Amino acid sequence: MAQVQYYGTGRRKHSVARVRLVPGEGRIVINKREMDTYFGLETLKLIVKQPLVLTETLGRYDVLVNVNGGGTTGQAGAIRHGVARALLKADPELRGALKRAGFLTRDPRMKERKKYGLKAARRAPQFSKR
């Protein structure tokens, strides 16, 4: 018998997360490591758990994640987006709650490109009057 799995892909900044929800006891595994060892900051762990807490499905599914690209904040946001999409496939009734919380919306904010003549995207070289 095939095991029931729900897939979701999440993106944030330059990170892409492929998320699988498997009925289980609530373990969250990111790149074959437990979430507690993968993310050091408590805020990042909270970001990942937000859709599960909102929909009250925290202990119902094991979350298996493959994530690459970007930094820790981008990866946490991508995982949150992917978990929300996977939960939607598991139970379409949750769409309203997830949409209101903004978890189904891809965050469009990206790093601004560096411009020539400047040191960074907007940082100008030091101005000398004389």
Curated annotation (Swiss-Prot):
Keyword Ribonucleoprotein recorded: yes
Superkingdom assignment: Bacteria
GO cellular component, one term: cytosolic small ribosomal subunit
Key words, A-Z: Ribonucleoprotein, Ribosomal protein
NCBIfam families for this protein: PRK00132.1
Pfam short name (any one): Ribosomal_S9
GO biological-process terms attached to the record: translation
Family the entry assigns: Belongs to the universal ribosomal protein uS9 family.
Protein name: Small ribosomal subunit protein uS9
Ribonucleoprotein among keywords: yes
Organism this protein belongs to: Brevibacillus brevis (strain 47 / JCM 6285 / NBRC 100599)
GO MF: RNA binding; structural constituent of ribosome
Matching InterPro entries: Ribosomal_Su5_D2-typ_SF, Ribosomal_uS9, Ribosomal_uS9_bac/plastid, Ribosomal_uS9_CS, Ribsml_uS5_D2-typ_fold_subgr
